[in-house]
Amino acid sequence: MHIKIQDENFNAESLAVIAILAAEGEPETVSLDPLRGEMRDFCRRVVVNENFRGEAGKLLVVPVADKTVRWAVIAGLGPEDKLTPERVRVAAFSAARAAASRGCSALSLTMPKAGDADRSRAAAEGCALASYRFNKYLARDEKDRFTAIEAVTVFDGCEKALEEGRILGESQCWTRDLANEPGCVINPEVLAAKAQELAAELGLACEIWDEKRIADENMGAYAAVAAGSANPPRFIHLTYEPENAKGHIALVGKGLTFDSGGLDIKPSEFMLTMKGDKSGACAVLGAIRAAALMKLPWKVTAIVAAAENMPGGSAYRPDDILRARNGKTIEVNNTDAEGRLTLADALCYASELKPDMIVDIATLTGACAVALGSTTAGLFTNDDEFGDKVLKASAASGERFWKLPMDDPNLRELVKSPFADLVNSAGRYGGAITAAMFLEAFVGKDIPWVHLDIAAADFAKTPFSYYVKGATGFGMRTLAELIREL
């Protein structure tokens, strides 16, 4: 998507779609800038007749009888004194989607105080997200019915913020594409190849380990999860390192390209959408992509322990005792609690790099989805100050996270095993918390760490807000926003 700024000599008559993001007010006063003359008068009459007040989430599409302008799209922002970047993002998405649904690939956009960087960034994100649809496997005639937004002109916007918003929105679409691919297409080797392609495109350092190297590196927990699959594991390590980096952040993503549950096999209906068990991995790859394209001043490491959890003859078993990279032993009492085993070795490795901070992101527990629903994800941390920075980034991105406690000593006891240092599943109650406590055992001492549990938030079963059905790319923009704000 191409995006540019128009100054005060805004030429509305040269564009097919005029999108106005309007703050709430009386129909007679709702802003219709930059419309002029007869077009403005006509749109005002429609606004008054429809009693359109610019409430958040409301959209009015006006067909315009003009030689070049075909539509005026007015999207409500709600009260200006309560205006947030998320409202701008949603309104811009709605306006751009309305243009695309009418076969228009370009639009102009205006809003109150467009020069505000946060508003410009959010508007560009919304427009970029409006172009998303995972349609590569549809018949050609079905593909051709969808119009993508290719060009956006913003009146009096902030140029740097608009470009950042474009990158963030397009990186989330890239993340969604990767997460939406089925297990028959994306296995660990293919995911590693995708990471290599990304590295080559952006000039990132890239290291890929095969199954022999993984075993040689003493990643016993990770290797055990991969043992039951005909598709071998791949360990992915990407690095973006600008000159004079301000610091170093490590991102660790869960990368199960498909999760059958292993020998503790899932019921068939629970296997649906398990192509999305790699969503954490896709999010960290999308985040390092965004960081590199925005040329952010922080060194970023993206780590993925990619594997497939299958019930083959060589699969790991309940009661097995595994040894992780840091020497800790783990009793397996549920082979479907596999993501934390792959993350354990990945977190050990990330800690050895001595970053200033670590964030892991994973579709980890059904317990988190039960607690918070499918549009809010869980946040856990060993450092409240760092956790608050991630929450601030999530608020700016519009991705909802809620901090859950990790200070209950009784729950911590449940993670212990009489036969090993830890047990990989501590039972049903407080399952999201005990999973986070398990992961904490593999984070280096004194390293600020945040764990993001995006189970259920990674996949939209029905369209809502700026999400279509399928992978959401949830968490990618929060990670990128965190790095941008550090």
Describe each region flagged by the PLM.
Residues M1-G255:
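Short amphipathic alpha-helical segment within the helicase RecA-like ATPase core
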Residues N51, A106, A192-L486:
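A generic structural signal for tightly packed, nonpolar segments enriched in small/aliphatic residues
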